[in-house]
């Protein structure tokens, strides 16, 4: 009889303990649970169900900070000259705006250089909303559409920063030229020193890159039309396996089709592939793009169901896609979803802008490479607090396969690598505009 009160107490303690364990092990409330179709070939939980430990968010000093008043007098006018594909030009624009504020200059609308390689002829105003950009940059930096009459007839003094080696300092190297010529143009250097940026210059860069750049109304209309045509929910996949991409990587792929091998050889020029131990070292460093077949294996290792709707955010000329679409059958592309006449008329920048819009708004984003588009998309998704973003690890894939792992053992090892990456947000390489928060 003495033991009768103890039993209810024991049951209560046991029940409470189990409830506490369930709460602690439940997925973080910050994680967006995407109702992707069931049917994973490797398990019941996909990568998006992994509980995150760290999270990137826009830094408070930028979003909530007080603007430093602009000086009464400008040191001159700066035009940022942007080259390459759309996302490379956008990267240069972001850097250039921060530099212009650093040098207390007035910003002239950037010049998007015609690039024959990208089949492109559109300028900044053809892709981005100029008035929106000027409005959002108000208080951060003065932006003008037209130069004063005494300067408008002159060509800017061109300052070549892009290929400078070593740490490049704009205050020491460019400010004297701006004061001398009053109107200069430049392409930002990759090796610039940001440690000398005051907070107001960094805030200007962040504002320009993540708050002020908006597609033109006509282009946004096309992007919304494309987005609406994709079955929901969906994953946006940035897959890079074009002939020029493979040729540039200098990697060897022995099991490709004859047509793919011929296309790669035609694009190689003097970029011969590495051989022997150098080839293995290069691959283990993560320098070789994933093939579509390797991408399939990677997605399956992450328990991404083969019935998932996938939007292929990619350029023209992808090779070896049969191996991918035979497994993941719900694949959608711009060329299929858009009006064929409109699609045929589109230039490279327009297509890249559409991929960008879809990718920053998709339920999930996966990249097989880590190029300019991936960096911009990852940052914008973070800005929008959309955290289902992942970069497939080429380095881990090469290292694990070199150890002889295959089948279920390889998939399990790849899962562990990417589970860790997703949990702590590793690999995003986000710029100074974002800060890490412990969850």
Swiss-Prot record:
It comes from Arabidopsis thaliana. Its main location: membrane. Its EC number is 2.4.1.-. Pathway: Glycan metabolism. The chain crosses the membrane at residues 8-28. It comes from the Eukaryota. One of its GO terms (biological process) is fucose metabolic process. CDD domains: O-FucT_plant (cd11299). Substrate binds at residues 238-240. It is a single-pass type II membrane protein. Glycans are attached at residues 104, 119, 293. The keyword Transcription regulation does not apply. One of its GO terms (cellular component) is membrane. It is found in: Membrane. Belongs to the glycosyltransferase GT106 family. It is an enzyme of class 2 (transferase). InterPro entries: FucosylTrfase_pln, GDP-Fuc_O-FucTrfase. This is O-fucosyltransferase 13. The keyword Glycoprotein applies. It holds the Pfam family O-FucT.
């Amino acid at each position: 009889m003495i033991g009768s009160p103890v039993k209810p107490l024991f049951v209560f303690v046991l029940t409470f303990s189990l409830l506490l364990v369930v709460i602690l092990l439940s997925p973080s409330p910050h994680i967006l649970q995407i109702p992707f179709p069931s049917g994973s070939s490797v398990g019941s939980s996909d990568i998006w169900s992994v509980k995150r430990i760290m999270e990137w968010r826009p830094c408070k000093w930028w979003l909530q900070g007080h603007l430093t008043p602009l000086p009464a007098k400008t040191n001159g006018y700066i035009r940022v000259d942007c080259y390459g594909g759309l996302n490379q030009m956008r990267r240069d624009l972001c850097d250039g705006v921060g530099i212009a504020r650093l040098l207390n200059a007035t910003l002239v609308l950037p010049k998007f250089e015609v690039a024959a390689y990208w089949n492109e002829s559109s300028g900044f105003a053809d892709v981005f909303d100029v008035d929106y950009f000027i409005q959002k940059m108000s208080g951060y930096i003065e932006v003008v559409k037209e130069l004063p009459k005494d300067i408008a007839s002159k060509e800017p003094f061109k300052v070549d920063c892009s290929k400078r080696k070593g740490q490049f300092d704009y205050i020491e190297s460019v400010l004297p030229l701006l004061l001398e010529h009053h109107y200069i143009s430049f392409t930002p250097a990759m090796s610039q020193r940001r440690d000398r940026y005051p907070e107001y210059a960094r805030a200007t860069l962040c504002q320009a890159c993540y708050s002020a750049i908006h597609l033109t109304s006509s282009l946004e209309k096309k992007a919304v039309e494309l987005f609406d045509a994709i079955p929901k929910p969906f994953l946006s996949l940035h897959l890079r396996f074009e002939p020029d991409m493979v040729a540039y990587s200098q990697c060897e792929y022995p099991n490709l089709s004859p047509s793919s091998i011929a296309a790669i050889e035609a694009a190689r020029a003097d970029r011969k592939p590495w051989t022997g131990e150098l080839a293995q070292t290069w691959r283990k460093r993560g320098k070789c793009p994933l093939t579509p077949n390797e991408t399939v294996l990677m997605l399956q290792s992450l328990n991404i169901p083969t019935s998932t709707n996938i939007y292929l955010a990619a350029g023209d000329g992808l090779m070896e896609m049969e191996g991918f679409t035979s497994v993941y059958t719900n694949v959608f592309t711009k060329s299929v979803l858009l009006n064929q006449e409109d699609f045929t008329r589109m230039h490279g920048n327009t297509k890249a802008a559409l991929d960008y819009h879809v990718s920053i708004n998709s339920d999930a984003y996966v990249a097989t490479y880590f190029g300019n588009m991936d960096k911009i998309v990852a940052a914008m998704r973070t800005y929008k607090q959309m955290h289902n973003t992942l970069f497939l690890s080429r380095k881990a894939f090469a290292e694990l396969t070199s150890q002889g792992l295959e089948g279920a053992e390889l998939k399990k090892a790849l899962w562990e690598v990417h589970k860790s990456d997703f949990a702590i947000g590793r690999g995003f390489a986000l710029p100074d505009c974002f800060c890490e928060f412990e969850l």
